[in-house]
Amino acid sequence: MPEAAPPVADARGSSPTATTGPGADATLSAVEPFLAHLQIERQVSAHTLDAYRRDLAALIGWASAQGSEDVAQLDSAQLRKFVTAEHRRGLSPKSLQRRLSACRSYYAWLLKHGRIATSPAAALRAPKAPRKLPQVLDADEAVRLVEVPTDAPLGLRDRALLELFYSSGLRLSELCALRWRDLDLDSGLVTVLGKGGKQRLVPVGSHAVAALRAWQRDSGGSAQTHVFPGRAGGAISQRAVQIRIKQLAVRQGMFKHVHPHMLRHSFASHILESSGDLRGVQELLGHSDIATTQIYTHLDFQHLAKVYDAAHPRAKRKKATE
């Protein structure tokens, strides 16, 4: 048996099913050693720890209501019933996935410490959460955003930043980290260090090249300096870019919430719409898995569906007659 855990903040009251059943409060202590492991050894955040506690409290409450006082002894069939009950209670697929993930981690920990012979949660799968389609700017909106006046304070920087964002589809972190040495403006290329330390070469469009040249002349940037420096002299912060893009969108008369990743989404969507080359878009974005890139095919289909609805004679809806 694991040693008793140090006290962990109580979150039992935060789940509707956490205290279901007569023995829920008594058996909640069974997961305290696991929570202590998360807190001390894995050093998870307080937010994550609270989520684990709520999810496991829900399992304990459900098991207690079924007459099972020891959750360590539940089998896969019982866990499947728990997932079904939570789904019927109205829990979203995303929340179910998180709840089942907490159960898997708990049973894996029990297995590692010899409390159980096999994990009843290993093979269980929650319903898939529908992927939310990314919001994008259409081509006209993108042009309106990037063509900010260059005679305003920091106008040259803002123009270069927006042009590069939309031209090359960089992640926010990648753009903030760029130094002038990473740019080959003569060849129209930028070398990007992406997730996992993976390097990729991305084209830079002619409008972005012109804007970057103007900004470099104005700022006196050298090879070692950041393309977009912050006030303290290092790289500009991601938060500063988020705030600035939001401000610029408002100034350009745009009424939707514009954020940095929207420019990356727009880049990917517009390239895919024009080329149809999903693999090429994957490489440009630096996605390790093409499944991540495939979300943009749904956006392209949405566009095609609108074109179809507007143009096809058999798709046009008849106006209701009185």
From Swiss-Prot:
Domain Tyr recombinase per the UniProt entry, residue ranges: 132-309
Localization per Swiss-Prot or TrEMBL: Cytoplasm
GO cellular component, as recorded: cytoplasm; Holliday junction resolvase complex
SUPFAM superfamilies xref list: DNA breaking-rejoining enzymes (SSF56349)
Coiled coil location: none
Primary subcellular site in the record, as a coarse category: cytoplasm
One GO term (biological process): cell division
Residue ranges, compositional bias (Low complexity): 16-25
Pfam families registered for this protein in UniProt: Phage_int_SAM_1 (PF02899), Phage_integrase (PF00589)
Catalytic residues as annotated in Swiss-Prot or TrEMBL: R171, K195, H261, R264, H287, Y296 (o-(3'-phospho-dna)-tyrosine intermediate)
Region annotation (Disordered) ranges: 1-25
Keyword vocabulary terms for this entry: Cell cycle, Cell division, Chromosome partition, Cytoplasm, DNA integration, DNA recombination, DNA-binding
Domain Core-binding (CB): 25-111
GO molecular function, one term: tyrosine-based site-specific recombinase activity
Family: Belongs to the 'phage' integrase family. XerC subfamily.
HAMAP family: Recomb_XerC_XerD
Assembly mode: Forms a cyclic heterotetrameric complex composed of two molecules of XerC and two molecules of XerD.
Biological role stated in the UniProt entry: Site-specific tyrosine recombinase, which acts by catalyzing the cutting and rejoining of the recombining DNA molecules. The XerC-XerD complex is essential to convert dimers of the bacterial chromosome into monomers to permit their segregation at cell division. It also contributes to the segregational stability of plasmids.
Name the UniProt record assigns to this protein: Tyrosine recombinase XerC
Organism whose genome encodes this protein: Xanthomonas campestris pv. campestris (strain ATCC 33913 / DSM 3586 / NCPPB 528 / LMG 568 / P 25)
Gene from which this protein is expressed: xerC
